[in-house]
């Protein structure tokens, strides 16, 4: 039964218009060009960047890495507006989160740029207490921390974490 589900799922993905572009160190201008092309040819509906710090900026040698990340962040926001599609960008956190007793990430932990926080409409973090505390009573529970939401409330949502499937699920009550 599991094999049949796997084959069925692979078929669904294969028949979809999912495009995976794993160009290493893609520049923001190259991404913009590809997204415009995909929008015309495939009616692009979503862009996911995994992850922001692997991209390169405009290539100006005078820019610091922080300035380069700021330019990338701003350009992704402009791309979302231009193509009218959501852009989801994963970002690395600074090491500061590891230094605190409470390891829940905060907006100030976004690595290399305050511009990410400023440009984003929504910022969400994942926190699992069992990652840091092996004896926790919260085993298998993930906190989805909505730290910023331009047009809505912030807060935390608890979900079940199913590592054997790399999946989040609603908690059973």
Which ranges hold each PLM region?
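Conserved Walker B
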Residues: 52
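Flexible beta-alpha connector loops of hexameric P-loop NTPases
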Residues: 1, 17-25, 56-70, 97-108
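Phosphate-binding/switch region of NTP-binding enzymes
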Residues: 67-173
């Amino acid at each position: 039964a599991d094999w049949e589900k796997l084959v069925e799922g692979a078929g669904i993905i294969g028949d979809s218009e999912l495009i995976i572009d794993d160009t290493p160190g893609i520049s923001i201008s190259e991404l913009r060009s590809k997204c415009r092309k995909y929008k015309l040819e495939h009616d692009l509906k979503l862009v996911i960047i995994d992850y922001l710090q692997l991209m390169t900026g405009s290539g100006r040698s005078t820019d610091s890495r922080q300035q380069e990340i700021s330019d990338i962040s701003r350009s992704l926001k402009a791309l979302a507006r231009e193509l009218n599609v959501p852009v989801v960008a994963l970002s690395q956190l600074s090491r500061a989160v590891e230094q605190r007793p409470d390891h829940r990430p905060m907006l100030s932990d976004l690595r290399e740029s305050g511009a990410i926080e400023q440009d984003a409409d929504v910022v969400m973090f994942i926190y699992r207490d069992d990652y840091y505390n092996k004896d926790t009573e919260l085993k298998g529970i993930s906190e989805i921390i909505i730290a910023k939401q331009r047009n809505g409330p912030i807060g935390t949502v608890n979900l079940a974490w199913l590592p054997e499937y790399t999946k989040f699920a609603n908690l059973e009550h």
